[in-house]
């Protein structure tokens, strides 16, 4: 039987503070980012003349059109299939496109935030090929919120950024795909964060150790490493956006940091590999049921982040690339994390 965590509610009003590192000057890092509004081109096509309209669309958007039709819409690469399925998608999603026009009429503030993030990427990873295009699109609701395309563009699916209260997100069909604890993050402010998360995932895929993490503690530190790098790319972005927690959940986690760690230790969870045991602590959810109503889902990310911060304080000459390449088990053992 697991020992329960007990946290007095009055403790949870305190806001934890992370030790802020000095933010480097990245003003000299050159970023050339062009925003391409693919959804405007797509929803301007003449559906009564699909072959020529699609050909014109291909001509204007050579790089992204193929990704959109074949990978995002999942249409077989045959002319008749593309024309038929694209027309069906057009009629099904034109109302969602209409809903996106006003909130994204001026995309410059979002582009500027993405550009700032890319400057930090270029500073910390000078050999990383920075994306030169930011492509917006409207895709299926069960498709991507954002991806890095094969031609190294950042693509953003606006259908998943129309605001947490958008009526379509309240339908039973969409709630089955995206419960409210997920759709509350369907806000435009998450676009720069998710663009940087895609780059973080790309960096980890290229640089992480070959040994797969299986123990809970390794998986938590894996997530903590990603969050630490994300913070480096977005130093001025609100913590709640980067963690995906509500501000109250984040404050609660800092306030109960010692109790959270004690729970994992006393219940012998750190070295567990059984997915049914590990999953509740490293997957998204409205809360971590085992800890209580006050907690966020994916609490393992928070714990791993604190461990990584502790290790980096002891190894302040270590680069972010070296952090990524260092085995998570090694980071845990060397950090000697023990919150007070």
Where would I find each of the regions flagged by the language model?
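N-terminal mature-domain "stem" immediately C-terminal to a signal peptide or N-terminal signal-anchor/transmembrane
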Residues: 18-87
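Acidic/His-rich structured neighborhood in mature extracellular/periplasmic domains
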Residues: 85-250, 321, 326-328
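C-terminal soluble interaction/assembly domains
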Residues: 265, 271-340
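Acidic/His/Gly-enriched intrinsically disordered linker/tail segments
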Residues: 221-287
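Short alpha-helical hairpin
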Residues: 83-95, 273-283
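Extracytoplasmic/secreted proteins, especially bacterial periplasmic and envelope-associated proteins
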Residues: 37, 116, 120, 224, ...
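Sec-exported extracytoplasmic/periplasmic mature domains
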Residues: 43, 119-126, 230-238, 265-269, ...
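Bacterial Sec-dependent N-terminal signal peptides
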Residues: 1-29
């Amino acid at each position: 039987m697991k020992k329960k965590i007990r946290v007095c509610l009055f403790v949870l009003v305190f806001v934890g503070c992370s030790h802020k590192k000095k933010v480097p000057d990245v003003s000299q890092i050159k970023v050339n980012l062009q925003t391409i509004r693919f959804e405007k081109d797509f929803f301007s096509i003449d559906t009564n003349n699909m072959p020529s309209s699609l050909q014109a669309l291909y001509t204007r958007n050579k790089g992204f059109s193929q990704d959109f039709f074949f990978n995002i819409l999942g249409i077989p690469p045959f002319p008749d299939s593309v024309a038929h399925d694209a027309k069906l998608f057009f009629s099904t999603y034109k109302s969602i496109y209409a809903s996106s026009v006003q909130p994204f009429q001026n995309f410059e503030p979002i582009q500027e935030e993405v550009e700032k993030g890319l400057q930090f990427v270029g500073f910390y990873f000078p050999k990383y090929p920075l994306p030169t295009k930011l492509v917006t699109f409207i895709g299926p609701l069960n498709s991507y919120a954002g991806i890095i395309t094969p031609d190294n563009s950042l693509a953003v699916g606006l259908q998943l950024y129309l605001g947490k209260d958008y009526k379509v997100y309240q339908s039973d069909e969409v709630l089955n795909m995206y419960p409210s604890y997920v759709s509350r993050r369907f806000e435009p402010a998450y676009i720069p964060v998710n663009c940087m998360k895609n780059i973080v995932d790309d960096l980890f895929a290229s640089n992480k150790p070959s040994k797969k993490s299986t123990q809970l503690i390794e998986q938590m530190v894996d997530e903590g490493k990603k969050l630490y790098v994300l913070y480096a790319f977005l130093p001025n972005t609100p913590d709640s956006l980067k963690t995906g927690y509500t501000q109250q959940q984040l404050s609660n986690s800092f306030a109960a940091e010692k109790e959270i760690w004690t729970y994992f230790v006393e219940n012998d969870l750190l070295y567990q590999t059984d997915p049914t045991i590990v999953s509740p602590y490293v997957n998204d959810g409205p809360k971590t049921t085992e800890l209580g109503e006050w907690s966020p889902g994916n609490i393992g990310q928070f714990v791993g982040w604190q461990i990584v911060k502790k290790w980096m304080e002891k190894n302040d000459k270590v680069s972010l690339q070296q952090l990524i390449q260092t085995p998570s088990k090694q980071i845990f053992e060397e950090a000697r994390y023990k919150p007070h």
